[in-house]
UniProtKB/Swiss-Prot annotation:
One of its GO terms (biological process) is cell division. Homodimer. This is Macrodomain Ter protein. HAMAP family: MatP. InterPro entries: Arc_rbn_hlx_hlx, MatP, MatP_C, MatP_N, MatP_N_sf. Signal peptide: none annotated. It is found in: Cytoplasm. GO terms for cellular component: cytoplasm. It comes from the Bacteria. It comes from Vibrio vulnificus (strain CMCP6). Belongs to the MatP family. GO terms for molecular function: sequence-specific DNA binding.
Length: 149
């Protein structure tokens, strides 16, 4: 599915991505010499409020091995941005313990579905089980009343 590209917004994302990589200690420039790399990074840091100039910086200074990763990150960010606009495509996140995720993942694989579908299935099964249990309890009560009379 294609999503509209918004230059200013995406340039800001690219700037943020590069700064985060730099803060994490990764090499973001194509320069081997540390003084050239430091100078290029300081130029990038000055471009925070001039997003369209980030593209020029990328063409001039960015390490080639980062190009594919940057494009993938921006593509994912663009998808999440546009999907967040509509309630039915908006993603929610939950924290799971590893063992819970592992059990859920195994169950989803058994069912041949996604994790979300597996959760939905398990909830509907639990609801159905509760209703059946309540019906059995009611029958037991009614039967015990009949027998005690």
């Amino acid at each position: 599915m294609k999503y509209q590209q918004l230059e200013n917004l995406e340039c800001g994302w690219k700037w943020q991505y590069l700064i985060n990589k730099w803060k994490d200690g990764e090499t973001i420039t194509k320069y081997i010499d540390s003084s050239e790399a430091d100078h290029a990074v300081s130029e990038l840091r000055k471009l925070e409020h001039e997003p369209t100039k980030v593209l020029e910086w990328i063409d001039l200074h960015m390490a080639e091995e980062l190009d594919k990763k940057l494009k993938q990150a921006i593509r994912g960010k663009r998808k999440r941005h546009f999907n967040a606009e509509q309630i039915h495509t908006k993603k929610k996140s939950i924290d799971l313990d590893y063992r819970v995720w592992e059990k859920l993942s195994t169950r989803a694989n058994e069912l041949g579905c996604t994790l979300s579908d597996a959760i939905e299935y398990l909830l509907s099964e639990a609801s159905r089980s509760e209703k059946a249990s309540a019906a059995v309890s009611t029958l037991k009560e009614d039967l015990s009343k009949l027998l005690s009379d």
